[in-house]
Amino acid sequence: MKKSTLIITILLGVTAISFAFYTTSEVVFTRYVDEDSKSQLSYLNFNLVSPAPEMDSSNYNDEFDATIQKFLKRWDIKGASVAVMKDNRLIYSKGYGVTNLETQEPTETHHLFRIASASKLITAITIMKMVDDGILNLEENVFGEDGILSSYSEMKDPKHKKVKVKHLLNHKGGWSWRDGDFMFQAAKIKRIMKLEGPPNDDDIIEFVLKHRRLRYKPGTQYAYSNFGYMLLGKIIEKKTNESYEQYVIDNILEPNGIYGMRISGNYKWERRPFEVHYFNHPGAYQFQSFDGNYESVEKPYGGSDINTLGAAGAWIANASQLVKLVSLIDPNNSYQLLSEESRALMVSGKNYKDAFGWKGARGENYWRTGTLAGTACFIYRKENGFTYAVILNSSVWMGHRFNKYIKWMMDKAILNLENHQQNLFYQNQNLKNILPLEI
């Protein structure tokens, strides 16, 4: 087939099926590439393209943009994805800064960022949808003879048999940070378990069960647990006989028009199409790679095993996709992904930390944070109808405490958007944003 014929065929096909920012997953192109170029893709499945609503420049708000840009300059943030909803209408979506310092490529709305622990919201929504569909019960045991993950039979502490699915959702499984974060102990686990390579999720589970005791009775004490959310990913796989990533894509994201989100890789050469580059704060130490293959790496690239975090912190997304996700469980939206009971359970605990997936919930205000080296993500659903998501490709020295500064900045910035009435979720997009490839 001639090159021109192929291009015309592709354009006609995409034009026929493109509405808003949806794409198809029917066609795959393969070609060799270098690791750093957006225009040269190692592979392209349309499903991996992350199309996103893009505003006409006439709708830009100078005051809003100035607030964002001042913030990025103040904290030396290289790039950002920002989206704002009002009453479940996407009223603002824009990229700021650059994705790559070397090429100075501008950040656009379709670029993908690691969202770190904001991934837990995706996992919790998936679990609650499985409850609604009768696939799972929150009272089911995780371990033991009658547990979902019964194959892990050897355990140092029999109290592990008392851990239920609901305990994992609100970080009350009984583990403690006094033992460190199991998801970031690759070298220790490899040594103790006498593994040949870095531990995978199965190795980590076996390590915890065989070598660690619960510090609390399950269900009694909050202790933030990445390990608990990794287990939720394993539960999803066990119950569905699918990979965690594919099940979420097929049953939560794509049926609701959210295309392009994927699980992140660890190294720079594992970046997905349209994924940004990540930058640690100036003066940050270098580390030995999690797999022991490199003596010294920048922490965003190989310092931690992001991929194995999986359900606890490995998704990549843009800000428009995140607010779209929140709209699916917003109590004021006419469309509800979850039953009223499941949606309410996610935010109705006695303590604000009892929320499922959210970092916290007070009244009708819910928030979710995510922090890794080179990454910061903040999602806030406000009782006044505003929801916003901010994702950064740079980290600052204060780590997770930086999230409050993002909140303060955005709460000020959105005051400039009170009169925006557009809904970018239903605005047809320029074809170049749906099919940005060169053949």
For each predicted feature, which ranges?
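Hydrophobic (often cysteine-bearing) scaffold residues that line and stabilize catalytic clefts
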Residues: Y60, F64, I115, S119, ...
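Short active-site loop at a secondary-structure junction
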Residues: R74-S81, T103-H167, Y216-S225, G310-G313, ...
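Residue-level signature of the cytosolic catalytic core of signaling kinases
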Residues: D56, Y60, F64, H111, ...
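Short, surface-exposed loop or secondary-structure junction motifs
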Residues: M155-N365, C377
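Catalytic loop of the DD-peptidase/beta-lactamase superfamily, centered on the K-T-G motif
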Residues: K2-I8, G13-G95, G144, Q246-D250, ...
